[in-house]
């Protein structure tokens, strides 16, 4: 080892020879962000003796300007010949190695701090990864080359360097201060054992986070599923219900298991990384990643479940690519069975995808096998990924979460909670979504088509377009044990039954789903396209003078900087004019020049598509827009009135858009927004009353444009309420009301020239009706007919009256009154049938 000058000379020659081939980098710039005190001794610790690992660490230290491990270091009055040691001591001349022994260097350092008065010493754990790959016994190539959990021999190490040396990554971890451990007063021997134990656990957890847990043979894993008690029970029940033999039922279960299970392959991961690196650089202008340190903080020692929003088929690939590039194990990804097609399915499966059917209903054996497979992933520490929205959002909104996968995760955790589960929300924001043209027809009201990976190939002709950037924000993690402690404090002491399906599971799963959706929206990446779409769609003809558009964008940026939506949300750089130039460069804006300047507008195709990008961030602006709405029909309003009516409307906005603030927090947040609007000149305050600007002023126009962001949402609320009140008590079922609302919205969109198909989106009415039921404003009788509380009338004539202009309310009431309920319901049912 290079502890003395002659050896250091030989080591330097070896390092230069090694780097004729090897290329290395630090994971997440960890060498450049170390917080060390250079006035105190710094030593590096590596897990196993390895000259090649040491050479890589020495090179990365030179790059980062850190103290080099092969150089002497002063320890009080003594000099250590080198500033590194191995956790597992080096073998002696006969090749014998005491794996339980302690490094002599560590013993001396601890003695210097504990007994000889040295102020402190800093120990920096360093890990070198020659490629990243979970081990799989079925692949001799992986066993020979990839970093894994097996003991590494010299021949294998050489092969690994030759095969994987150009993809070498180094992780520098935070320093361990020996002074802090010595001050615990446990004595030299116990402190030494404690330091060794801390380092062993650290290296094990880091290795799990970076290369994944030790994978067993896939064939053994699949067969192991069939031996699980719950699967055995399902097999026996299948035999009885279908009157088939045990062997045949086991064959069916085995077929299900093989259909489901992923087959992680390091060569495929590396292949995809190369392809995707080219793809992002070719198609997009880079990927901006924010808050990934949150994942790195929780990856060690926890089971990570990534829950991204779902906007595009490339979401699957993007997240795995980013995690791999940042030194984290790509997750096992839940994918729809429709993607398990020849060639594509095999690549996805080897890239970590496991496949699931859209519905498990009526197939208890499949359900048992799938649940057991997920439980195996969770209990063994494999990170996983699934989309709580179910499918891709065609409207740009956060879809209402599907609770199936969350319920399976919850039940698995109740079954075995030894390994904590942490949900990591991931917001993926595109400035131009790849499937935009596919979504365009659906936004115009065409029937939703079945999802297929081949949708991606339909956009090949559009690859000459500029797609801008992709933004990936990691949200605030949700610790499942802490979530259960809040909502079911005695969950660990309850008798959960043989299937781990307590009575409170459905309600708790729904609460978890809403939490995940809100955390996803909290991490919104607000980009230039979102803001321009929001501004132009708030005008009557989707057009604005360029200088006016720049002022609106500057206003939006100023408001969001004054009252940030959440610590996880991000804003674009630049001012309003810079944002306009950027969006123009993407050919999303049309322009017309005249003597007074330039008018920017959205053509018909881009106007419909712009609703998608506006909807990405509608939840961010919903509350200030609601506040602004109170001044469309009122020149002034007291704070007390505004708060009262806002409290009445907010629960419905929150339920539809998954807005982050609770009702208890609402008053304080509204006060912040009122102060921001006053600061920007959009409101004026006199004592406890807020006054809008003069209608002829520029500030008034800005205020009204802000209010229009949520006008269509409030109109839909008012429509449903007006139809209910007009029909009377116990006259309509929820389904009849939903259909009636859809027909009415379609008619209003024709009458008022609204080019926004989502205005009559049936699912939005369905969820609004469900929210009214959840809040007990509506009730169902035995026949399913709806009765309403007197609060409904107050909502219509109190709150709605103050946020919707009189002409809009009149138009809605006229349409509701002109059509007898029975006739409209019949027509709506005909429309539904067609």
Swiss-Prot record:
This protein's record includes keyword Transferase: yes
SUPFAM superfamilies registered for this protein in UniProt: Glycerol-3-phosphate (1)-acyltransferase
Cystine connections: none
Pfam families: Acyltransferase, GPAT_C
Catalysed reaction equations from the record: sn-glycerol 3-phosphate + an acyl-CoA = a 1-acyl-sn-glycero-3-phosphate + CoA
CDD domains the record matches: LPLAT_DHAPAT-like
Bilayer topology term: Peripheral membrane protein
GO BP terms in the entry: CDP-diacylglycerol biosynthetic process; fatty acid metabolic process
Span of the annotated motif HXXXXD motif: 309-314
GO cellular component: plasma membrane
GO molecular function: glycerol-3-phosphate O-acyltransferase activity
UniProt keyword list: Acyltransferase, Cell inner membrane, Cell membrane, Lipid biosynthesis, Lipid metabolism, Membrane, Phospholipid biosynthesis, Phospholipid metabolism, Transferase
Subcellular location: Cell inner membrane
Database matches in InterPro entries: GPAT/DHAPAT (IPR022284), GPAT/DHAPAT_C (IPR045520), GPAT/DHAPAT_LPLAT (IPR041728), GPAT_PlsB (IPR028354), Plipid/glycerol_acylTrfase (IPR002123)
Pathway: Phospholipid metabolism; CDP-diacylglycerol biosynthesis; CDP-diacylglycerol from sn-glycerol 3-phosphate: step 1/3
EC number: 2.3.1.15
Family: Belongs to the GPAT/DAPAT family.
Entry remark concerning the domains of this protein: The HXXXXD motif is essential for acyltransferase activity and may constitute the binding site for the phosphate moiety of the glycerol-3-phosphate.
Name of the protein described by the UniProt record: Glycerol-3-phosphate acyltransferase
Source species taxonomy: Bacteria, Pseudomonadati, Pseudomonadota, Gammaproteobacteria, Pseudomonadales
